Amino acid sequence: MGQNQSAQGGAGEKKDDKDKKKKYEPPIPTRVGKKKRRAKGPDAAMKLPQVTPHTRCRLKLLKLERIKDYLMMEDEFIRNQERLKPQDEKNEEERSKVDDLRGTPMSVGNLEEIIDDNHAIVSTSVGSEHYVSILSFVDKDQLEPGCSVLLNHKVHAVVGVLSDDTDPMVTVMKLEKAPQETYADIGGLDTQIQEIKESVELPLTHPEYYEEMGIKPPKGVILYGPPGTGKTLLAKAVANQTSATFLRVVGSELIQKYLGDGPKLVRELFRVAEEHAPSIVFIDEIDAVGTKRYDSNSGGEREIQRTMLELLNQLDGFDSRGDVKVIMATNRIETLDPALIRPGRIDRKIEFPLPDEKTKRRIFTIHTSRMTLAEDVNLSELIMAKDDLSGADIKAICTEAGLMALRERRMKVTNEDFKKSKESVLYRKKEGTPEGLYL
């Protein structure tokens, strides 16, 4: 009985061993058909490439020589980088020392005179002059009398040179975009347009005409007449028609706060005009600086007279202006200094009178061409009236008539609107003061 039980237990153990042997085991993975993973990181960069074939042959020798060349190039590059590191650090250190010597902030001055290689006389914006030293790191080739230099704020030593020393005020005076006005926008003034073309446009576009005639073209013109007769408008049309550089300035801009800044601005204005020649310089309201000279104890009046003297020198000085034409405008020509408007400086004086009936009609036609007029509008009544209307007054009448129609929510301008606007414009012109905004 016991033997049977032991036999049965042995058979069960053998059966369990067979089950264990039959347990599934996955096959060993193979590398056939799979890409070998590339090692990454610094270890891969330092590892030399494998060279095949493994046997000794000439092909293996050539590959090893090529690897050697690459390693030598890498070694040379690393040594050069290591050698340049101290130089870069040295340059950075020297640059910081130069910045410390210059100091911050740096003031801007004008170089008046170079005494020797290490000393110069400079002037500041307040007008005072100083005998100062020139530091060794300043480029001496760029130093010349009249240039703008950087000064140390404590000892006023020259620590640098401004490469672009163009006055920002002169840069603003240069027109980047031509005005929209053309000769077609000017009513009448046919004679004035012809004269300014002969004096300004033709010498720049066709100088050979004057050479064949054996004459020198005019250097400049002055436009004078009552206010609102089209002087500035004609200058805008000239700027639109010509491709020359156009510089415009108002006479009051030449009057500066500090001593000597006004003449300096005039010199800078004409210097920029020469650099960008052919060019046209338009000076509006010239009576602000060009009035008759008289004895005065006021420092401001003497500064204005010095500015005018510099303007006289630029117009007809020792140096020729070249292809630089000057247009001046004023409504008080009787107050100008005779030396300013004499022949040789201003060769042509173009008068702008008040418009006659024919000119008034053309001006009204220009300003009403885009307006929607009612059938009862009769512009002849406004034109035939004996009122002293300038071109600006006619434009104001048309604008006021359009505003009256807009106020009453009408799309057409009537004859009554023109009558009321004319009365309003003439009343304001007579009184000289604008009407009250609130009634």
From Swiss-Prot:
<protein>
    <recommendedName>
        <fullName>26S proteasome regulatory subunit 4</fullName>
    </recommendedName>
</protein>
<feature type="binding site">
    <location>
        <begin position="225"/>
        <end position="232"/>
    </location>
    <ligand>
        <name>ATP</name>
    </ligand>
</feature>
<feature type="region of interest" description="Disordered">
    <location>
        <begin position="1"/>
        <end position="48"/>
    </location>
</feature>
<dbReference type="InterPro" id="IPR027417">
    <property type="entry name" value="P-loop_NTPase"/>
</dbReference>
<dbReference type="Pfam" id="PF17862">
    <property type="entry name" value="AAA_lid_3"/>
</dbReference>
<comment type="function">
    <text>The 26S proteasome is involved in the ATP-dependent degradation of ubiquitinated proteins. The regulatory (or ATPase) complex confers ATP dependency and substrate specificity to the 26S complex.</text>
</comment>
<comment type="subunit">
    <text>Interacts with PSMD5.</text>
</comment>
<dbReference type="GO" id="GO:0043161">
    <property type="term" value="P:proteasome-mediated ubiquitin-dependent protein catabolic process"/>
</dbReference>
<feature type="region of interest" description="Disordered">
    <location>
        <begin position="82"/>
        <end position="104"/>
    </location>
</feature>
<dbReference type="Pfam" id="PF16450">
    <property type="entry name" value="Prot_ATP_ID_OB_C"/>
</dbReference>
<dbReference type="InterPro" id="IPR003593">
    <property type="entry name" value="AAA+_ATPase"/>
</dbReference>
<keyword id="KW-0539">Nucleus</keyword>
<dbReference type="Pfam" id="PF00004">
    <property type="entry name" value="AAA"/>
</dbReference>
<comment type="similarity">
    <text>Belongs to the AAA ATPase family.</text>
</comment>
<keyword id="KW-0963">Cytoplasm</keyword>
<dbReference type="InterPro" id="IPR003959">
    <property type="entry name" value="ATPase_AAA_core"/>
</dbReference>
<dbReference type="GO" id="GO:0005838">
    <property type="term" value="C:proteasome regulatory particle"/>
</dbReference>
<dbReference type="GO" id="GO:0005654">
    <property type="term" value="C:nucleoplasm"/>
</dbReference>
<feature type="compositionally biased region" description="Basic and acidic residues">
    <location>
        <begin position="12"/>
        <end position="25"/>
    </location>
</feature>
<dbReference type="InterPro" id="IPR041569">
    <property type="entry name" value="AAA_lid_3"/>
</dbReference>
<dbReference type="GO" id="GO:0016887">
    <property type="term" value="F:ATP hydrolysis activity"/>
</dbReference>
<dbReference type="InterPro" id="IPR003960">
    <property type="entry name" value="ATPase_AAA_CS"/>
</dbReference>
<dbReference type="InterPro" id="IPR012340">
    <property type="entry name" value="NA-bd_OB-fold"/>
</dbReference>
<feature type="compositionally biased region" description="Basic and acidic residues">
    <location>
        <begin position="82"/>
        <end position="102"/>
    </location>
</feature>
<dbReference type="InterPro" id="IPR032501">
    <property type="entry name" value="Prot_ATP_ID_OB_2nd"/>
</dbReference>
<dbReference type="GO" id="GO:0036402">
    <property type="term" value="F:proteasome-activating activity"/>
</dbReference>
<keyword id="KW-0547">Nucleotide-binding</keyword>
<keyword id="KW-0067">ATP-binding</keyword>
<keyword id="KW-0647">Proteasome</keyword>
<dbReference type="GO" id="GO:0008540">
    <property type="term" value="C:proteasome regulatory particle, base subcomplex"/>
</dbReference>
<dbReference type="InterPro" id="IPR050221">
    <property type="entry name" value="26S_Proteasome_ATPase"/>
</dbReference>
<dbReference type="GO" id="GO:0005524">
    <property type="term" value="F:ATP binding"/>
</dbReference>
<dbReference type="GO" id="GO:0005829">
    <property type="term" value="C:cytosol"/>
</dbReference>
